Structure formats: structure tokens, C-alpha cells
Amino acid sequence: NLMKVIVVVDMQNDFVTGALGTPEAQAIVPTMVERLRELNAGDNLIMFTKDTHYADYMDTQEGKNLPVPHCIEGTPGWSIVKDISSVVDYGSNFCFYSAKDIMKSRVLKNTFGSIRLAEIIKSLLPDNPIDEVILMGVCTDICVVSNAMLIKAFCPEVQVTVDASCCAGVTPERHLAALETMKSCQIKVINE
């Protein structure tokens, strides 16, 4: 039974309706809910990344370049958008470090791309025939592209796909530019 791994990138309140929210991010929520309902079946694994910053955010390199505090651990803005998290009922926020916890998958990250996420997906490969890794979320041109590239680097023989209808960029132009960059790197872009 071939399994798909679905990675929902940073669909947190601060990126949708909060500090860094955009109309485009809000617009993809219903489409994503529908798509996740379809994909939440069989042996498929749905994973969520959570951008996670702390009180020292403004002192970090990211904070100096983007001086907008967001996704501070424990704040409402850090939580995953309710419509999205309610599709897959894993209970409370959960960060896992072992295969037995795999179905309760929350990967916390304080960087755009998560090496931990790529390592976890790679670690599944020996025992699980992964047919495809599908990414969706925000921002197309920052965290989606960063994670797609990392997964492709860690798992070169796995089909990495990005569902454009479930992604939003910092701007619509940057969204499209990121999709083109990913296509150049043999990441499949669907539903444009």
C-alpha cells in the first residue's frame, strides 16, 4: 500500500489572519480543508509544521530582517488555524521524535526550512513505500519552497509535489516565482 505524506506548512493564525496574514492565505483555507479531507485516508500521513519563535525573536537574524514578532510559542498566533487542525484530530499540539508518535505529527521549527522534517520523512522510507510527499501552506516563497527543497535533497527518489491551490505567498507575484523555481528543481506543481 503506497502512502502519501502530506506536509501542511505553517498554517498558523499569525500567517493567515494575524501579524503576517494576507487575503491570499485566508482564501486558501476552504480549499485546503477540502483537500485534507480527501487525503486523510488509508495509510496517508498528515504532518504539520509550526513556525515557532521565542521572546528573543527581535534579536535573531530573521527578526532583524523582518521586525514583526509572530508565532511566539504559546500565543494564539502560534496555533494552527482551527478549520485546518480540526480536519485531522490529533488532540493538542504535539511534537514527536520517534516513529511510534508518527501519527501525532507536529514539527516545531524556528527556521524557514526544517531539517528535522526532512530527516523524519527520510527515516520513514526503509519501512514505508512513500509514493509522494505533497506540500501545502504558507508562504510559498519562504517556508514552502525551503521545505520542498530540503525534502527533495534528503529523499531524491521520492516524488515531491506542491499543491499550488493550497499555497499562498507573501505576494501573488512571489507565489508564482516560487512555483517556477520549484519546477526548475523537479518539484511537481499541481492545481495552478
Tell what function each PLM region has.
Residues 131-143, 162-167:
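Glycine-rich anion-binding loop/nest that anchors nucleotide
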Residues 36-37, 121-126, 152:
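Generic structural signal for well-ordered alpha-helical scaffold segments
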Residues 59-60, 117-119, 146-147, 173-174:
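Short, well-ordered secondary-structure micro-motifs
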Residues 108-127:
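Alpha-helical scaffold elements lining the catalytic groove of polysaccharide deacetylases
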Residues 1-106, 127-131, 157-161, 170-191:
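Active-site acidic carboxylates
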Residues 114, 167-171:
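Short, small-residue-enriched loops and turns at beta-alpha junctions
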